[in-house]
Every structure is written in C-alpha cells, then in structure tokens.
C-alpha cells in the first residue's frame, strides 16, 4: 500500500497533484465509488457526473485480436486515440489499447507463435511474460501498408478465445460512424449498459476529520494511523492492508472509532472508464467540503508501465479530502 497526502492549492489547476497523477496511472477502470456530504454543491456535481456517464458508449465483441485493426474500428476510434479497449481471454495473454497505444502481454508460447516484437518483463526465465507497446497513431501504420498488415497477421496468430470491451466518449464520434462500425465489423457488437446507482446513506458513521499540522515531524493525524485505518474501513476497502482472511471485522481488535453520524450521498458506477474520464469526474467533486472517490481496475486489469514491469491483481485508488483539515487530501494506492 502506498499512501501520501498533499495540500490542495488555489493554483493547482496548473499543476497535477498526487491524486491526479495516480488516477492517470490507471488507464482501465471498472468501478467508481463516490461519497459526498448532503449539500447543494454535491447535488449539482452528481447531476453533472450522471450526464457524463450517460454519454459514454460501452460495447463488447468477441473474435480474433486481428479485429482490432479492422479498418473502420482502427481509423475512427483507435488511430485517433479516443477509444479505450481491454481484453478478456481463456489464457494469461492480455491486450489493451489506451490513447492509441497497443499494449500486449503474452506468455512465451504465444510470443513465439505470434512473431510480435516484444521484450521480456523480467530477467527471470521462469514464467516470464513478454510485453510489447506499439503506437497505433504512427504515420507508418496504415491499412494495406506492409507494417500494418504484418501486425494484423501477428495478432491473428494469437491462440485462445478472446473478448474485447470498448468504450469512448459519445460526443467525440458522430453517430453515423458508430452505426457503420456496428454493421461493418464481422462479429456482433453488443451494447453494454453502464451501471449507475445513486442515493443517500441515512445516518452513516463518519470517521473524525483528518487533522494534521503538516509539519516535518508529524506525517499522521493527531489520532495516529488507527484513524487512517478507520477511514479505510469506512471507504469500503475492508482494510486490506491489515485484515487477515479469517478476521470478519475490518476494525482492529478492541479499537472503537470515534465516528460522527450523518447522512451521506453516494454514487456507484460500473463499466469501463478511461483515466481521462475518471479525472473529469474527480474535478467535479474535488472542491466540495469533503469528498471521497474510489477507483478500481477493470477485471483486475492494469497497464504495463514504461519500465516493462508487469502489474497484476486488483488495484484500487482511494482518495479522501476534508476542507476542515488545512485542505489536506489523503490518497491510498492498494495493489
């Protein structure tokens, strides 16, 4: 678990804070949880968030990975960088596309069969995966050009059964292009609904506000790390960092949190969201008196970073902000 806190500054619109940086590291997100106080600013933010989510398109299709370079899908959605795509297969291989970058993670046999130019993710020979990152926005990758057709053939040689999930902002693509893709793709494109639930939690227990002097010698609030863990529990992550599988209660033994009781607005969204969409939603709530946003990866899917180290397993980003605490924002990364 990584944890950091930053001070929200007036000029922060010009400079990314830690939370924004971490959101941008999660290119493929499947679940967002937002908690807000009951006030007018929260209601307005929820209306804006609902509109943004309703304007997202979310599709599923199954077939060979070569479908990703189908001319209509490639030229309008992938080459322009507006589409976010993640794969699901019956093996350990993974394919994803974000902002026009194709990332492929393959086991050794699939790497050898495909002929894709990839690098090992580790110096350890056992269970090493092979990783490739290809810029599909390149001027040298065009339909019917040699490099394009070579990559398409390599993707077509990948074994297994594949499904792909595609999302993009509807306002960036004319409806005629969406209809054309649905008819021209040789496999069915199934429209998936983004699940959005919102409501009010009556008399919810709220941890005490984070209090910190932000001096060099005190990196925790006045009540110490126990209060931090209590906030983690409230944010529904079940205190993964300390809880053993045989312990049903996420609270630390004999620790009684000093919680207040109040009503809370909640918003829970399930689907597929790019990092830019998550950042857009975060900007709508960041200045409300207190707020929480939780982001979970899509089907335990994480990107491969620039150092070619493979990330796997669940990834969660939790961020809590309270204006009463010297504008401190706590951000947790759970992996």
UniProtKB/Swiss-Prot annotation:
Taxonomic superkingdom: Eukaryota
Any one GO biological process: tRNA 5'-leader removal
GO cellular component, one term: ribonuclease MRP complex
InterPro entries (UniProt xref): RNase_P_Rpp40 (IPR013893)
Pfam families in the record: Ribonuc_P_40
PANTHER family noted in UniProt: RIBONUCLEASE P PROTEIN SUBUNIT P40 (PTHR15396:SF1)
Protein's UniProt name: Uncharacterized protein C6C3.09
Organism of derivation: Schizosaccharomyces pombe (strain 972 / ATCC 24843) (Fission yeast)
């Amino acid at each position: 678990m990584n944890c950091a806190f930053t001070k929200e500054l007036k000029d922060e619109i010009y400079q990314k804070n830690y939370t924004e940086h971490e959101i941008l590291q999660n290119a493929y997100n499947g679940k967002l949880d937002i908690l807000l106080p009951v006030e007018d600013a929260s209601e307005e933010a929820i209306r804006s968030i609902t509109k943004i989510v309703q304007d997202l398109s979310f599709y599923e299709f199954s077939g060979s990975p070569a479908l990703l370079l189908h001319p209509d899908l490639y030229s309008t959605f992938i080459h322009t960088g507006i589409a976010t795509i993640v794969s699901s297969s019956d093996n350990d291989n993974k394919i994803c596309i974000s902002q026009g970058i194709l990332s492929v993670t393959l086991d050794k046999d699939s790497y050898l069969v495909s002929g894709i130019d990839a690098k090992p993710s580790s110096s350890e020979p056992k269970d090493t995966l092979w990783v490739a990152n290809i810029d599909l926005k390149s001027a040298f990758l065009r339909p019917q050009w040699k490099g394009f057709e070579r990559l398409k053939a390599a993707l077509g040689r990948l074994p297994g059964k594949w499904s792909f999930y595609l999302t993009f902002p509807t306002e960036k693509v004319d409806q005629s292009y969406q209809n054309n893709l649905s008819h021209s793709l040789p496999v069915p494109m199934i429209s998936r609904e983004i699940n959005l639930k919102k409501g009010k939690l009556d008399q919810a227990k709220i941890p005490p506000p984070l209090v910190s002097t932000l001096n060099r010698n005190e990196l925790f609030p006045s009540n110490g790390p126990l209060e931090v863990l209590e906030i983690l529990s409230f944010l529904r992550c079940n205190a993964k960092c300390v809880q053993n599988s045989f312990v049903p209660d996420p609270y630390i033994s004999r620790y009684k949190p000093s919680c207040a009781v109040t009503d809370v607005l909640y918003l829970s969204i399930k689907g597929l969201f790019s990092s830019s969409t998550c950042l857009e939603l975060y900007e709508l709530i960041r200045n409300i008196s207190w707020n929480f946003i939780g982001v979970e990866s899509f089907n335990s899917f994480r990107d491969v970073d620039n150092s070619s180290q493979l990330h796997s397993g669940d990834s969660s980003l939790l961020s809590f902000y309270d204006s009463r605490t010297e504008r401190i924002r706590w951000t947790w990364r759970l992996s």
